[in-house]
Amino acid sequence: MQGSVTEFLKPRLVDIEQVSSTHAKVTLEPLERGFGHTLGNALRRILLSSMPGCAVTEVEIDGVLHEYSTKEGVQEDILEILLNLKGLAVRVQGKDEVILTLNKSGIGPVTAADIIHDGDVEIVKPQHVICHLTDETASISMRIKVQRGRGYVPASARIHSEEDERPIGRLLVDACYSPVERIAYNVEAARVEQRTDLDKLVIEMETNGTIDPEEAIRRAATILAEQLEAFVDLRDVRQPEVKEEKPEFDPILLRPVDDLELTVRSANCLKAEAIHYIGDLVQRTEVELLKTPNLGKKSLTEIKDVLASRGLSLGMRLENWPPASIADE
C-alpha cells in the first residue's frame, strides 16, 4: 500500500444488496479506524430526521367534525383512519402541495388505490388499507391534503398557527415526511494488504417506496457534504482588508483661500467677510459675493475662473461644514 503515513484512505462503494425495492444494504470500505462509526452515525441521523418527502397533513371526512368520533358503517374509528392515512406513501412531482379525493361506497376495504389524483401524484403502495366499510349502504368521502416537507412535524406544532383560519371538520395529521422507515448501520473489520485495523461500514435501510435506498444514501451524503463546506472553506478565509476611511471633505476645501493666489483686492474682500477657507468660499453664491464691499464683477469673474480650474464652483452645498478640525481653530 503506497502513500504517506498521514494520508487517509478513501472508501469505495463495495456492494449494494437490493433485498427488495424498499430494502437495501450498502457496504463501504476501507475506512480508517473509527471512521465507520463517525460516518455511519452522521448518515443515520440525517436519513432519519432530515430527508425531504411528502406526507398527509390534513384530512376532511364528510360527516365528521372531530377526530374523537366514529362514522356509521365504517369499522375503524376516526383516529385509526388518521393513523392509516399517516402511513400513506405518496410521490409528488413539481408541486409542494396537492389535494387528493377519495369516494367509496359498498362493503369492503378502502385502500389507497381508491384515491383520485392527477398525473403529478403517484401512490406508491396502492394496496395500503385506509379503512373498512361494513355495510352495503355505507360510504365514505374525504379530501386529503399532501404537502412536501422534511423530518417529522406533529399536528400540535401547527394547531396554534392555524387555529383561527382552520374550519371545523378539518383534521390535522402528524406529518412524517421522511421516506426512510428504518435505518441501521454496523461496523465490521476490514483489511488492506498488511493493515487489519480498518473499518467496513454496512448500512441497512428500508424506505416507504417513494425513494430508492441507494438514492436516499446519496442524498444524505450530499446534505452532510454541503453542511461541512463551511468548515472546508475556513482555509480560504482571509483577514478583511482595512479600508482607509475616506475624508469627509475634499482636502482642497480645507485649504486657505490664499492658496487660490487671488489678486490682493479680491483676497482682502474675502477676508473682510470672514471667508478663510476654500470650503467657506464655494458655499457663497454670486449674489452674496456681489454684496461684499469693494468686490465687483471683475473680482467675481476672477474667483469663478480660479475655482473652475480646480473643479469647483460657487453655490455648492457642504453638509456638516465646517469640520471639527477647522471649527476648533
Swiss-Prot record:
GO terms for molecular function: DNA binding; DNA-directed RNA polymerase activity; protein dimerization activity. GO terms for cellular component: cytoplasm; DNA-directed RNA polymerase complex. The keyword Hydrolase does not apply. It comes from the Bacteria. Residues 249-329 are annotated as: Alpha C-terminal domain (alpha-CTD). Keywords: DNA-directed RNA polymerase, Nucleotidyltransferase, Transcription, Transferase. InterPro entries: DNA-dir_RNA_pol_insert, DNA-dir_RNA_pol_RpoA/D/Rpb3, DNA-dir_RpoA, RBP11-like, RNAP_asu_C, RNApol_insert_sf. SMART domains: RPOLD (SM00662). GO terms for biological process: DNA-templated transcription. Its EC number is 2.7.7.6. DNA-dependent RNA polymerase catalyzes the transcription of DNA into RNA using the four ribonucleoside triphosphates as substrates. HAMAP family: RNApol_bact_RpoA (MF_00059). NCBIfam families: PRK05182.1-2 (NF003513), PRK05182.2-5 (NF003519), rpoA (TIGR02027). Homodimer. The RNAP catalytic core consists of 2 alpha, 1 beta, 1 beta' and 1 omega subunit. When a sigma factor is associated with the core the holoenzyme is formed, which can initiate transcription. Belongs to the RNA polymerase alpha chain family. This is DNA-directed RNA polymerase subunit alpha.
